[in-house]
Amino acid sequence: MKNANPLEIELKLALPKACLDRVERHPMLTEGAEALTLANTYFDTPDGALSRAGIALRLRRQGNHTLQTVKTKGQGGGGLSARQEWEWPVDGTLDLDALAALPPFESALDETLGRLAPVLATDFVRRRWLVEHQGSTIELVLDQGEIRAGEARATIQELELELKAGDAASLWALALALAEAIPLRPSESSKAARGNQLSRGEWPLPDAATPSQWLHRGLVALDAHLDSTDDSFQADAKSAFTALAVHPELDEALRPTAQALLDAFDTRDSDPHFGHAALALAHRLAIESALS
């Protein structure tokens, strides 16, 4: 297996399709990117036991090779997540014996092993760069493709920054540097979570009371709008960011940034100011919430 005590730390960023060329031309990504075609199948029980537990189980095919991956529910927010992850090569089918030995399946989920079946798929092309930034090594990937859940489809168009060595603070620093020129924004939803929501046709929004919770709710609403194309989620996001900007508990030093976020809302797909403000707020507010 990949390692005995795995931890994946990454920052996920949504990217408008029209701005792909800005990524490819960015001066921090001058080296040619490796391009990989990845076909992924996610598994769960008919009643969604893994999804409810915040577990993602997939087979990833790249050429003639197949990897089996298990990811747990993470902690973080504002696009940043820290999750346990196990990954190892298999012969093309689920390795149930190895699954049974993993912590998530040793107790409550052990009975799910005989009921696992494919529930959704993601197919995308991944372009990958290794970036040295502020003394850290970061893998930056650009994923383009689609999520398929039954007849439903959603577009994958995102950047992921994964810490390979160094300090997690460098992920924020690199994202903020990219956001100076690229209209990206934090994304709160993993591909597996997006697929599960797409399958159900439901995109629940989290309750909010504190400034960090309002930011989280607004970002989740934008993710929901992207996949559902329901404009009510766009209105929900704007309402959440309005509540954040006027919140009495918001640090006064952050209020101008929250207002800048709100002011740039309607031009967020072309103007970098929205994403830069969202990243700055997410970093400073240090959102801590369970992720799926």
Predicted ranges, named:
Residues 1-292:
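Phosphate-end processing signature that detects enzymes handling 5′-triphosphorylated RNA
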